[in-house]
Design a protein with these regions (language model features):
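Extracellular/periplasmic carbohydrate-active domains that bind, remodel
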Residues: 1-135
Length: 135
């Protein structure tokens, strides 16, 4: 699959389980143009993807403020491997993270081009949350 110039978030996985994202290529360099945004997502494999996005390549989220606290469903058990990151940020945790993010594993990924941060943890003092990360 090839995604080009999609507006805003290209793939938003909301309250999803047991998902595999594999072999996607991106050329989508618009403002706030994320590649994959799993939110309240469990058991996700992201592999063999070439990102070239205008913002976050993978942005793991789990609810904003009261919505996240009420839902109490963390994003967890996420494996990201064998990916090429070229967007602004490689793997982002937050800032919507009120339900927590845990058991994230990143391996064998490359970062290049205009990528500012390989791993970026976005926080907000009002949102709370928990991160459990494996790299």
């Amino acid at each position: 699959m090839f995604i080009t110039n999609a507006p805003f978030w290209c793939i938003h996985l909301l309250k999803s389980e047991n998902i595999i994202c594999r072999g996607i290529r991106y050329d989508a360099k618009l403002v706030n143009n994320d590649g994959i945004d799993p939110e309240y997502t469990r058991n996700l494999l992201i592999e063999n993807i070439e990102f070239n996005n205008g913002d976050d390549n993978v942005a793991i989220k789990c609810g904003r403020d009261n919505d996240g606290w009420k839902t109490s469903c963390p994003s967890e058990n996420i494996i990201i491997r064998n990916c090429k990151f070229k967007g602004l940020h490689g793997v982002v945790l937050g800032s919507e993270m009120s339900s927590g993010i845990q058991h994230v594993f990143v391996e064998n990924c490359t970062y290049g081009g205009y990528c500012k941060r390989g791993i970026f943890i976005k926080t907000n003092p009002d949102r709370g949350g928990l991160f459990v990360i494996f790299m």
